[in-house]
Amino acid sequence: MTQRWNVQQDSLEILEMPFYWRLSNSVGTSKIPVRLPIRITARLEYDYLEFRPTDVEWQAINNAYQQNANIGFLNPESGQINTYGSSVNRFFLEVVETYAPEKTFEIGCGAGFSIQFLRAHGFKVIGIDPSEYSLEWSKRLGFELINDFFDEHLIYGKADLIFCNDVFEHVPQVDQFSKAVYKSLKQGGVFCFSTTNSTQSIALGDISMLEHQHVNMFTEASIYLLLANAGFSDISVKSGSYGNTFHVIARKKDSVIRKIESIKLASCKGFFERAYQKLTAFGDFYQKLGYSSHYYVPLRCIPYLATVGNFGDSDLYDSNMSWQGKYIDGYARPIKSLSDIEYVANGSFFIGSMTFHDEIKRTLIAHGYPEKSIHSVYTL
């Protein structure tokens, strides 16, 4: 086994990792590289981790979006509509009902799933999304779309409410993005969004949340700091009802004096030392059991497998039935489902997800796997 990662005092690099951007029916290649390096560093002033792509990697990310095959969790192809999607939409509906905005925009609206949901409850939303994918769905479903990239000039001072889902973690220079949203709101306007909660991963030195498209990994403190720095007040950061997410609300109220001195910092401080320990421990696990082990939750296991150069030597499992038999670009085996699990004597599983760890562990035990054969980030 060759170590395929480097950790410095202020950065972490995986030399090559599957560039997840679609689920395919075969291992066929695309015009986009299937594996690319990934590097992260810490923005300590805002207490979050930031992916630092090269120009080549940014081009690959842009091409992935343009090819219309990128799957967001609130798009029809994802299989997450009735779980994750339902949780997020209930949050957005609650905010819209509370503030009754006259002019509402969704940044990164994709197929318009949330727009359609709010429309069914009597609220009009204008989508903002530059993709051909979104344009096709706006024509199909009949919602209004600004088919362009969002910036501070696009809807300057016009919005009563702006919301987005699974966007905040994808945006480079998210501090500038937050300021652009602030400038786009009317006085008293509201910004709400759902984004990934990486607090636990950062605290443990865990890399399971790494994806090339997730350019930011946030703690609760980092959300407060970014929004307060942009000018927002009345900031609320709460856990979502499904998965490991933040549900965030903030308001544009210039008359309010913002106090951020009391926010506890340094969650990211020491992350790279902790990550070094986790990756070293995973390498030891892989040498002992990993070659024959199975891995549960593909997107969360792939970063670890990439650190040991495993791009298709092990079976990946997921509970989402719509993923069964599909391939992730850069990984040579199809994803298996619960129905494929069979107990094998002396077999083992590695659970990549912390969010659904306990649920998955119970499932594996029910299939006959003894607790001592089930491993995870917690046991490294």
Where are these regions (language model features)?
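General small-molecule cofactor/ligand-binding pocket signal
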Residues: 146, 236-238, 336, 374-375
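Conserved N-terminal segment of class I S-adenosyl-L-methionine
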Residues: 2-165, 246, 253-289, 302-303
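Conserved SAM-binding loop
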Residues: 87-205, 217-235, 250, 303, ...
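Short beta-strand->alpha-helix junction loop in the catalytic core
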Residues: 197, 244, 380
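Hydrophobic, well-ordered beta-alpha structural blocks that scaffold small-molecule cofactor pockets
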Residues: 247-380
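Acceptor-substrate binding/catalytic loop of class I
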Residues: 27-35, 206-221
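Conserved S-adenosyl-L-methionine
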Residues: 13-14, 232-243
